[in-house]
Amino acid sequence: MNAHPRTFEAKPAIRESVPLLIGLMGPSGSGKTFSALRLATGIQQVTGGDIYGIDTEARRMLHYADHFKFKHVQFDAPFGSLDYLAALQQCVKAGAGVVVVDSMSHEHEGPGGMIDLQDKELDRLAGNDWAKRERVKMLAWQKPKANRRALINGLLQLNANFVFCFRAKNTVKPVKVNGKTEIVPQGFMPIAGDEFLFEQTVNCLLLPNSGGVPTWQSENVG
């Protein structure tokens, strides 16, 4: 046992400026990039610092260069968790007050992302032995999950505001109704890991043809 118990000090609570983590999710064409840059501009007016845009979408963020002032960071594959962390850290070190990431979904299912890394780990551990691959499936998640945890922990140490864009897909589920199988809509599901979404200060969904106006209706979210 510890012979010297830890001591803790309580002070009056004072509101401080806490960095924002904002998640914008939606299908293609829902206005994620424009909305993210508009949000970033509003945040910058309060907190200062430069706006940095990390672009994994083949330079598409540059379409809005005439509308918003920001520094563009081209981010190509691989899209590993630690690659994202390095990009975020470099932006903050360079003076970013707000960082827009479009798209964060590549960290989950893009080349070099979490799902891709788990598949590579399966190849390393079991090769083409399909029975063994099934046995070590959970073990193969250890490295991808550790890398994502490192991303999250590192992100939370950065003194800047972040706006993350997530792709979303419309999901369905087969359901038995009166002995027949019917396809029931389940809403939009963001392409991202739950543990990353949980860290956001706020998440909102941009529906198609919404003009960038978010919806908070739970039935629209898978």
Functional labels for PLM-detected ranges:
Residues E57-M61, M104-E107, M114, A168-K173, ...:
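Conserved nucleotide-binding/hydrolysis micro-motifs of P-loop NTPases
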Residues P27, A146-G222:
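Phosphate-binding/switch region of NTP-binding enzymes
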Residues V98-V100, V163-F164:
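Structural motif
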Residues V101-W141:
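Conserved P-loop NTPase nucleotide-binding/switch module
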Residues N2-T7, P12-A94, V98, S105-H106, ...:
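Conserved P-loop
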Residues A65-D66, G112-G113, V175-V177:
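Short amphipathic alpha-helical segments
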Residues G80-S81, W141-K145:
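A conditional alpha-helix N-cap/helix-loop micro-motif detector
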Residues F70, I115-K120, K180-T181:
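Glycine-rich, phosphate-binding/catalytic loops in enzymes
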